[in-house]
Amino acid sequence: MVDYTEGSGKQYHTGVGPSDIGKYVILPGDPKRCAKIAEHFENPRLVADVREYVTYTGTLCGQKVSVTSTGIGGPSASIAIDELAKCGAHTFIRVGTCGGMQENVLGGDVVIATGAVRMEGTSREFAPIEYPAVSDFGVTAALKNAAESLGISHHLGVVQCKDSFFGQHEPEIMPVSYELENKWQAWLRMGCLASEMESAALFIAGQFLRVRVGSCFLVVANQERAKKGLENKQVHDTEIAIKVAVEAMKELIKKDCNS
């Protein structure tokens, strides 16, 4: 493979090297959320800002930790986790937003993904479609414990991952509307909790790379409730999910240090 770093020791896309990051990394999509997440660290500093990838590094519980944005969707997320793993990171928590699907998943709740429907394309370049996209049990348990200790309403279950945001929200305008709408009904009947765009790629890439990956999301709103004329409050305070991710990472660090 061509060395696109030209011997710099820095990863080509993310711009980080092994000395820049911790072994524990939080992965938001939005670069602007990185500074907000880094406020939870001790002595955070900006270490890289390249394309959609912004990275801050600090400490939690005495251990070096980082936050790196991934941008939107599976392709950029898989690049991030691949390059971060090459730099020595082994534990990842994806934190972001999602849209609720089941009626009881309300705006302001947190969804913790146990697995993901592989409706996106990135994961197919890692593993056959029959291979399941599942989260790491230890990370998922830590996320659940964090949500419970913080008193945050939360749900554990499968999320649906797609590549087209508007294919979900306006399927009727798409040439393949029949497929999108029929599959959406299938995901609902199977009990999918929410829809988002990165977990499937991250779970599959993580399994290939032998690293731990979990995901938690703030539910912004629920389009199924809106369709049925039910109350459908919108919540955009991502700090709700960020707190869950940070507390979960603290638990994982403490357990690792004591094992």
Give the label of every model feature segment:
Residues 44-49, 151-158, 252-259:
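Flexible, glycine/charged-enriched surface loops at secondary-structure junctions
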Residues 1-142:
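Metabolite-binding pocket within alpha/beta catalytic cores that recognizes anionic/polar moieties
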Residues 200-234:
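Zn-dependent metallopeptidase/amidohydrolase metal-coordination segment
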Residues 90-91, 193, 212:
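Short acidic/polar active-site loop segments enriched in Thr and Asp
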Residues 142-150, 205, 244-255:
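Generic non-transmembrane alpha-helical segments
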Residues 223-259:
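His/Asp/Glu-rich mid-to-C-terminal helical/loop segments that flank catalytic regions of hydrolases
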Residues 27, 31-34, 70-77, 132, ...:
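Generic structural signal for well-ordered, non-membrane alpha-helical segments
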Residues 133-191:
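Active-site rim beta-loop-alpha module in soluble metabolic enzymes
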